[in-house]
């Protein structure tokens, strides 16, 4: 039904514009929002015509600045606007006359303010769009990021396309999520920051992502919905076809108040959302940090549903804390059998090593070859479903750091030969030097095709959420 309505083709065209007008772009302030969109399009090397528009005219990066949309030669597909709210309807009419399919309004100051005058202005904007046949994204949002079409609202985003589609009511949360996920090896097919949703809304974009062959995972950050019945129907359909990860904002009294002033949404009862997600097998992290952890897990361990874990890392106390964290989340740590223990003793001295799972290799770092053999043996152990390694730069003395880095490289090589799922924890550090080491090691993990987490608790929770999701998915078949 969706394909026959033509809406898929319309939205697909919006994600792949052939020409863009940047209405309200400034030549003097490089930090102005429309300038950010302009700079991002240039950084991403958008291939179609780009038209900067500002009543003052002039030149920007060698491009003529047009004084109005009407001055643009030929037609445009898409417009990005940061003009004042009061002239937004006029801009829509000008864009319609130029053949635009959609206009994105970054502009705030509409219905989210609660002011009656600007609420009426938003209604006028919707009416004008309806009259002219143009679709509106926003207002009060960042718009669209589609690396395939070289369209972005942040020049720090990855230029590489991926398989995650993300719908976010918040522009800031969308930027945070994309940036953090990119560093974790997660790339996106499409990202939509839709703000007030005066026209196109969460249901429209969700329906598109369900159909989109480039999207394998769907993520959402929502503060409220416009049509609960339609959204629920789409959510149920989406959850049967693709993994869905949903963070709901505005859960408490204060959050609900912030929601109403942020995007003009009604937050809704959080217990209703919890029940809905359980019924439809939707993964519901508590916050954006957890969402990124879950997306990294789904990206690199999509079918993960293990319970028995092998934990490996340097430090007895850290190993104890990590074991506690995983057991609290329902994972099991099978004890190393006597037979395997005897084989391990052939590679490694028992003193200082916890050869009972978790494995503390801190006393074996001076003999990385033997340690490599020991880890390879353990990863073949039939009682283990998956392996988790960890590294804590802040607990190491300066003299041990280089040795630990070499040992960690050896561990990752041993894990790389395993056919079992492997995850890695690289904890953040306070000092710049140690944080740089942590970042370097985390990027090695990502390059090897494994999920990386920044804390024991984050890893255990994300793995739990994905394991439970996959088990429920099987029961729904």
Feature annotation, model-predicted:
Residues 1-477:
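Catalytic-core regions of core metabolic enzymes
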């Amino acid at each position: 039904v969706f394909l026959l309505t033509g809406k898929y083709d319309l939205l697909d065209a919006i994600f792949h514009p052939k020409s863009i007008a940047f209405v309200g772009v400034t030549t003097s302030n490089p930090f102005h929002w429309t300038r950010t969109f302009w700079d991002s399009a240039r950084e991403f090397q958008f291939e179609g015509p780009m038209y900067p528009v500002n009543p003052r005219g002039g030149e920007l990066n060698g491009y003529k600045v047009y004084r109005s949309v009407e001055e643009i030669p030929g037609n445009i597909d898409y417009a990005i606007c940061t003009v004042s709210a009061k002239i937004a309807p006029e801009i829509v009419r000008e864009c319609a006359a130029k053949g635009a399919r959609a206009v994105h309004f970054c502009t705030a100051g509409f219905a989210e303010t609660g002011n009656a005058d600007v609420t009426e202005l938003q209604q006028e904007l919707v009416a004008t769009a309806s009259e002219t046949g143009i679709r509106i994204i926003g207002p009060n949002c960042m718009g669209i990021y589609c690396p395939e079409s070289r369209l972005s609202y942040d020049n720090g985003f990855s230029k590489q396309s991926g398989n995650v589609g993300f719908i976010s009511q918040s522009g800031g949360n969308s930027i945070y999520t994309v940036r953090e996920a990119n560093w974790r090896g997660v790339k996106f097919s499409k990202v939509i920051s839709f703000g007030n949703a005066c026209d196109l809304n969460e249901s429209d974009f969700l329906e598109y992502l369900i159909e989109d062959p480039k999207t394998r995972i769907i993520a959402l950050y929502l503060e409220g919905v416009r049509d609960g019945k339609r959204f629920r129907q789409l959510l149920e359909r989406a959850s049967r076809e693709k993994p869905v990860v949903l963070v709901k904002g505005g859960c408490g009294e204060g959050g609900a108040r912030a929601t109403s002033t942020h995007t003009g949404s009604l937050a809704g009862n959080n217990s209703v959302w919890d029940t809905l997600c359980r019924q439809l097998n939707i993964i519901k992290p508590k916050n954006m940090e957890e969402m990124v952890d879950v997306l990294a897990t789904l990206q690199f361990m999509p079918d993960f549903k293990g319970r028995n874990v092998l934990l490996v890392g340097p430090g007895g106390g850290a190993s104890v804390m990590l074991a506690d964290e995983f057991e609290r989340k329902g994972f099991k740590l099978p004890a190393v059998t006597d037979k395997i223990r005897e084989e391990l003793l052939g590679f490694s001295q028992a003193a200082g090593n916890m050869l009972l799972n978790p494995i503390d290799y801190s006393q074996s770092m001076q003999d990385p070859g033997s340690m490599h053999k020991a880890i390879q043996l353990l990863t073949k152990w039939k009682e283990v479903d998956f392996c988790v390694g960890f590294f804590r730069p802040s607990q190491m003395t300066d003299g041990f750091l280089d040795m630990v880095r070499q040992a960690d490289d050896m561990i990752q090589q041993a894990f790389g030969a395993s056919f079992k799922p492997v995850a890695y924890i690289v904890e953040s550090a306070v000092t710049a030097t140690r944080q740089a080491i942590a970042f370097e090691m985390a990027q090695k993990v990502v390059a090897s095709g494994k999920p990386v987490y920044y804390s024991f608790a984050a890893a255990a929770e994300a793995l739990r959420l994905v394991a439970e999701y996959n088990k429920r998915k099987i029961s729904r078949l």
